[in-house]
Structure formats: C-alpha cells, structure tokens
C-alpha cells in the first residue's frame, strides 16, 4: 500500500486551464522513474487528489478498529498518508513513515536541498516538486526596482535553480511570482492532502484542510528521492472556536491569542486542530493565517477541517473540480462527530476561544508570544521606556497578504485619504503573489494605499525575513531604539532589518494601517481619533473586508516554468570559484568511538533561535555555499559567560576573544571537534538546515540543550550531529567555559536509552550528568553513517 508517487496515467498530457477568462495552455508532465510516476505543472492534478481520496474509507475504517475509537481530522489525513498502515501510532512516542503528496521549496533553502539531491544519483524527483524564488529579493526602493536588482544580483543562483529544476523534473516559480506559501495555497493545496516544504511557515496550507509541514532540506530530499518521510507521531491540541469575529478583530488575533496561551514552545511535537462553529465562520485565507503562524508556537502543523469557506476559495481560484471532489468526500475531511461532541477525550489538550469576546491583539517585542490587547500597548510602552513613535509600518508577508487582508486594511486607508490623512511613518505593502498583486491593482486597492503614502514592494518575503535595506533610516551603531509594527509572523531581535535596537510588534493588517496613520503605538483604533489637517477629529470606521474578489482573480503575468520533456543530458554548472554556490562533500561517518574531551564552542543564554544560529538578511546570498554561510555561525548567540559582546566568545586553543564563526573556523583548521550548549527551545524559528549544517561542517559533534525546537532537532540528526537534552535542566548551570565534555557509550546508542556526559573542569575535577535523546532506530543509522543523506546515497547507488 506504498504511496511512492501519485500522478497521471500517461506520460504527457496537455490541459487548457481557464483562469478567469485568461487561457493558459499548460503542459502536464508525468515522468516515469524506477520508483513510480510523478507530475509537475501549475496546479495539483485532479487524478492525484482522486488517488488520495480513494484510500480514505478503507484506511480510516481499519484505523478506528485498531485504535478502538473515532478519529480527529488531523489523524485521518496522517493515517491516509502512512507508508504502511500497520505502524504503531503512539502519540509523542512512536516514529512513523509518511508519504507526502508533494514537496515545495523556497529559493534560500532550495539551494542546499538541491545540492544534496544532486549527490543521490537519481535522474528525476520521485514526487511533484516545485521551487519558488521569493527569499532573495531585498526590499529597498519599490517592487519593480527591487525585483530588477535582485534578478541581477542573484542571477547565478536563479540560473542554478531553474536549470536544476529542469534537469530533475521540477517546476520553477520565477522571481516575482510570489511568496511560496501564498502560491501553494492558490495552486497546489487541497483538503486531505499532505505537503512538506523547506520553510517553517509551510503550515499555511492547513487553511485549506491540508497537512502541511515545514521541514529541513534533508527531509525534502528524502521524499524527492522516493523514500518515506520519518517523523514522530504527533500529539494533538484541539482549539475549539466559538462565535464570530466582529469589528476590528481579525483571524490574526486568534493565533496571537493562542501564542499567548501556549507560548513559543507549547505546541512542540503537536498538531493543532481547530474546530467548532467559530472555525466555520472564518474565511479560508483567515484559516491559513492562523495555521501559518502556528509555527511560532512550535507546532508540527495546524489544520482546519473542510467547510464551505474552503469550497468557496477553491472555486474562486479556478479549482471547481477539486471543490466538488472534496465536497463529495466531506465525511473524511472533518473530525468524526464523536470527537466534536467530546473533544477532551480525543485531544491531549483543548483550548476554547470565544471569537465574540476576542479583541485585537499586538504581540512583541522580540518574541511572538508576548501578547496584549492593542489599546494596552501605549501604557506598557511608557512603563518600559519603549519609544511611542513608529518608524515603519509593514503590511503583507505569507501570513497576511490575502485579498481579504488587503481589502480590510485598504478600507481604512481609503477612509483616511478622504479626510486628507497620510501615514505618519514609512508604510510598506507586500502583495503575497502575482495573482494577488494583479487583482488588487485591478480593483484599486493598491491605489488606496498609495493615496496615504504607501510604497508597494515586490511579491516576495522582503522585510519579513530580513531582506530589507533601511540603512538610511536606522543607525546600528548608536543603539537607538525604534519601533516597527508589522502584519508578519516573527519579531526576534534583528529579524526584520538587522538592527538589534528595533522593537518589532506583530498584529493584523488593519491594525497596522491604523497605527501607521496615528504614527504612535499609543493609539486605540477602536476608541481613538485622528486629527485632520483642518483640525477636526475623526474616528476610524470598522474595517470592511471582502473575502474573495467579486470579479474573480486576475492571474497577472505568467511566472511558472515547467520542466522540459527531456533534460537528463542538461548540465547543472557550479563554478568552483563561485562565492554563492558550492558542491557538497559527504560528512564523514561516525568512527565507532565515544566523543572525548570536547571543548565548548558556545554556551548560549536565553533565546537561541535559528536566526541566532544562522542569520538571514545579508547572509541569504550564501545559502548555497556551505563554507561561506558558515561565516555567520552563532553570530547572534548571547554568551552565557559574562564579559562578551553578542556573538563573541573565547577561543580555548589560543585564549583570544573572537567571534564564534572565527573560533569555529579555528577549531576546524586544528581538526578539533566541539560541543554547543543551548538553553530552552534551541533552534526555535525557521526550517533552515544551515543552522545544523554549519556546525557539522565546522566539526561540531554534539548539541546539548534544555529543550529543542522540533525542526532544528531533526535537522541536527539529519546532518549526523548528536542532539541531547539535559535530563535535569539545572545541569546547564554547572557547565563552565573551560570545561571539556566526553560523551559515553555511543556504541550502545538506542531508542529511549539515556546518554551519560562526563565533564572535566580545568582544575581536574570531574562530574557527570544524564541526557536524553529522541533518536529512532532509523535515525541512529543516520548518526552512524554520518548523515541521513549518506544513508540515502548508499541505497540509491547500491
């Protein structure tokens, strides 16, 4: 019953797709491989979805019998994608093999994923795969200018991605096509399906009832090479939504409230499943917003059941065949009735939120779970000495750039313009996709923003991921705090603009618009008033949103490149002198010995996110060059030992104070392996596997933390490192800068067994502490082979 691949029955077909009166003759390409059949084109073929739905009935019936109970919706989708239906399903304990329907990758993480895939020795990808050029476009002037600049600056990388997609049978969405998650929602997501993507906000697809999970590039390579994806069977958190949103309250406020309740690590190892009448009252794109930002609570993914709003969105995005097919399978695309009647019996945790009572929220700074209602921010800012003045307001990102989001914010801008009001700070708008941009341009919504002084950026991630050049606005040297408000998802220090003094707050697009008009965080959009040029005071009206464009979506410019019919002879060139791309050498296998006398490269205090470990922003250009990107290793880490600036520590070989990447390079050149120590939730944030590949490249062998974020822990395992968790979190405090660590009994590494770490202090005194790990039997083979990719390579080339 293996799901090695799902596709069309014949080799080549041509289908005409009607995109709201815009006819696109799209090549559907089905590629025969020794592992099955796959298809790449601009939408998910109905045949693939029919195949997925065809196994629901039998699999779910058998699962109910096996488990002796009814099923939640998330369980239904996962069970239907099991490689083998006979695997043990113990929440938070057993590991399972899954067969995702497709893979999506963004251009920053895709480089390393493709470089890894190229070493596997296969001619084609085994499942439908797409690469989306959205991360490498830096915002500076405005959309067209920035896109042209990016096309020149990143020409080598774009050429590589386009050619590697062509050679191996994948689709390529060109720069300007839009943010990966918005494009996936518009083109590929479908209820009951499963996708993995090399970006942590892949769960955006849960808004259409899809299991959509962010992974590292090595995980994607597993699936692209035809292997199942191995993951721990998740726990389940149920969120019961009651009532309806009203007034200024938006879907964004739901997830901001959930983040407050669960915190940034409360969802770790769990899928969050939303249900209830309140869930049905949300639009599909509103659902996507909530699922998208579920990454900020550490959740494996989030999901909503199929309902009428999802049906409407599918029809509006020219997928009526998918909508009708989903409707006819609706019983499988929602939780069983008994689950909805007694959710406490089926979920590990249940949260209830009354949407009628929910009020607009704004979270931050520096962490997405520091929440309060919008009207409370002014007083809190004053008490903390934060600036009240807003330096920039930003609307968009993969979290909040749907048509409905834009219409609600634009209604505020339109009203303000009628009274002669302008934004009192820099206002930047990011359309989520070319389709959204073309549609909101046609419908006059971008003009509404421009009337109050907004600048429209490229259809890309931009400032949300640090691709924002605002060097003329801020001075990193002075350390002068400044405040920005965004409709984004993350607000870690330096995340958006590289400035550690920037205080970033996340909220809904309409609240961002209101605060931009006020120019201060000390403003209540609901009860406050704004002064016009004539001295009159006006209160802002309640935002008015339109769920879907009445005239349909305008697809805009064609930005998809399908792979050619036969490109196996195509050569993917990587210059040996390139500073952007570098072919990979396999990491060495474990030598069979314990790790002895390892120095500590860094012991990090507090947040130790992937942004702290491997910064984005200006470093994004090196994402395809492992040696060069390693120049940012741990630059954002706060040293737990006193007397150091951020990103600095002591080189124990020389006694010098250096940056962490300088120390790592020194240890590498001296062939000195080392260990890294983390605090709580190490690796929180993005899916970037560079945060695991860089330390491995520089001879990092072990990472020990009080706890790990899911994706980062998996990425460390994939690259052959040993992530260990303190059995007693207090042992973290016992480790000193000059200590040497030895990891014992690695020959006995097995699931569930504790690992002993011996510590030798500079005085000669020794002590030991226990650690736990989450390795499965299969994952232990990754460790022994040196990486998961080494295991794949040995099997594909045998």
Language-model features, listed with the residues they occupy:
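Single conserved hydrophobic/aromatic residue that forms the stacking wall/gate
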Residues: 1-15
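Mobile "lid/hinge" segments at catalytic clefts and subdomain interfaces of large enzymes
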Residues: 41-44, 191-323, 421, 460-463, ...
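Flexible inter-domain linker/hinge segments
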Residues: 42-47, 57-62, 68, 77-83, ...
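Long, structured ligand/cofactor-binding scaffold of large enzymes
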Residues: 49, 56, 61-234, 624-673, ...
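Accessory "access/gating" subregions that flank catalytic or transport cores
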Residues: 148-152, 156-157, 162-197, 273-276, ...
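Extracellular/luminal Protease-associated
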Residues: 275-280, 489, 665-708
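Acidic, glycine-rich flexible loop/linker segments
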Residues: 530-547, 713-782, 789-792, 797
């Amino acid at each position: 019953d293996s799901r090695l691949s799902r596709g069309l029955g014949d080799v080549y077909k041509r289908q005409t797709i009607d995109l709201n009166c815009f006819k696109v003759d799209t090549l559907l390409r089905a590629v025969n491989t020794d592992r099955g059949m796959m298809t790449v084109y601009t939408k998910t073929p109905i045949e693939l979805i029919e195949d997925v739905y065809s196994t629901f009935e039998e699999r779910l019936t058998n699962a109910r019998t096996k488990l002796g109970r009814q099923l939640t919706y998330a369980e239904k989708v996962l069970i239907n994608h099991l490689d083998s239906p006979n695997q043990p399903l113990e929440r938070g304990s057993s590991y399972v093999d899954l067969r995702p329907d497709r893979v999506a990758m963004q251009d920053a993480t895709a480089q390393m994923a493709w470089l890894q895939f190229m070493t596997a020795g296969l001619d084609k990808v085994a499942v439908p795969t797409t690469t989306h050029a959205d991360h490498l476009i830096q915002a500076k002037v405005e959309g067209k200018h920035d896109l042209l600049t990016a096309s020149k600056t990143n020409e080598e990388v774009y050429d590589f991605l386009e050619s590697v997609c062509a050679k191996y049978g994948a689709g390529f969405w060109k720069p300007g096509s839009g943010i990966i998650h918005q494009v996936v929602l518009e083109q590929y997501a479908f209820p009951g399906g499963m996708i993995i993507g090399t970006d942590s906000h892949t769960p955006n697809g849960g808004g259409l009832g899809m299991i959509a999970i962010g992974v590292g590039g090595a995980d994607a390579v597993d699936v692209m090479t035809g292997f199942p994806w191995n993951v721990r069977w998740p726990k389940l958190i149920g969120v019961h939504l009651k009532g309806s949103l009203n007034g200024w309250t938006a879907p964004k406020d739901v997830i901001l409230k959930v983040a407050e309740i669960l915190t940034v690590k409360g969802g770790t190892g769990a899928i969050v499943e939303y249900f209830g009448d309140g869930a049905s009252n949300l639009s599909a794109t509103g659902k996507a917003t909530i699922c998208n930002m579920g990454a900020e609570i550490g959740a494996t993914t989030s999901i909503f059941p199929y309902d009428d709003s999802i049906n409407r969105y599918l029809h509006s995005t020219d997928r009526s065949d998918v909508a009708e097919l989903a409707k006819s399978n609706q019983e499988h695309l929602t939780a069983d009735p008994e689950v909805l009647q007694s959710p406490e019996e089926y979920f590990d945790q249940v949260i209830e939120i009354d949407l009628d009572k929910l009020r607009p929220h704004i979270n931050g700074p520096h962490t997405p779970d520091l929440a309060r209602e919008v009207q409370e921010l002014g007083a809190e800012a004053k008490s903390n000495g934060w600036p009240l003045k807003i330096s920039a307001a930003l609307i968009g990102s993969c979290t909040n750039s749907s048509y409905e989001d834009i219409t609600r914010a634009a209604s505020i801008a339109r009203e303000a313009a009628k009274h002669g009001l302008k934004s009192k700070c820099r206002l930047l708008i990011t359309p989520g996709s070319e389709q959204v941009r073309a549609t909101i341009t046609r419908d006059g919504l971008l003009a509404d923003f421009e009337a109050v002084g907004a600048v429209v950026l490229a259809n890309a991630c931009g400032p949300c991921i640090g691709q924002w050049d605002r060097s003329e606005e801020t001075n990193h040297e002075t350390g002068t705090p400044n405040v920005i408000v965004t409709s984004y998802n993350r607000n870690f220090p330096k995340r958006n603009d590289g400035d550690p003094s920037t205080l970033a707050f996340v909220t809904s697009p309409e609240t961002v618009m209101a605060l931009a008009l006020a120019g201060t965080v000390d403003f209540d959009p609901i009860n406050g008033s704004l002064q016009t040029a004539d001295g009159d005071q006006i209160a802002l009206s309640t935002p008015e949103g339109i769920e879907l464009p009445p005239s349909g979506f305008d697809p805009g410019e064609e930005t998809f490149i399908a792979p050619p019919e036969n490109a196996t002879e195509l050569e993917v060139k990587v210059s040996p002198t390139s500073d952007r791309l570098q072919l990979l050498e396999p990491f060495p296998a474990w030598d069979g010995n314990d790790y002895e006398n390892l120095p500590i490269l860094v012991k990090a205090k507090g947040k130790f996110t992937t942004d702290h470990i491997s910064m984005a922003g200006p470093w994004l250009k090196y994402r395809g060059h492992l040696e060069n990107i390693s120049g940012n290793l741990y630059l954002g880490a706060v040293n737990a030992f006193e007397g150091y600036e951020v990103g600095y520590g002591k080189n124990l070989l020389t006694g010098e104070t250096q940056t962490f990447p300088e120390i790592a390079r020194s240890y590498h050149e001296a062939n000195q392996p080392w260990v890294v120590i983390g605090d709580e939730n190490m690796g929180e944030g993005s899916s970037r596997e560079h945060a695991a590949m860089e330390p491995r490249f520089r001879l990092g062998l072990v990472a020990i933390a009080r706890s790990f974020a899911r994706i980062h822990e998996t990425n460390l395992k994939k690259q052959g490192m040993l992530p260990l968790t303190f059995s007693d979190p207090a042992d973290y405090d016992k480790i000193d800068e000059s200590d040497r660590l030895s990891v014992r009994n690695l020959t006995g590494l097995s699931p569930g067994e504790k690992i002993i770490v011996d510590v030798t202090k500079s005085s000669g005194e020794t002590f030991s502490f226990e650690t736990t790990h989450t390795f499965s039997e299969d994952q232990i083979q990754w460790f022994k082979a040196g990486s998961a990719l080494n295991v794949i390579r040995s099997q594909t080339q045998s």
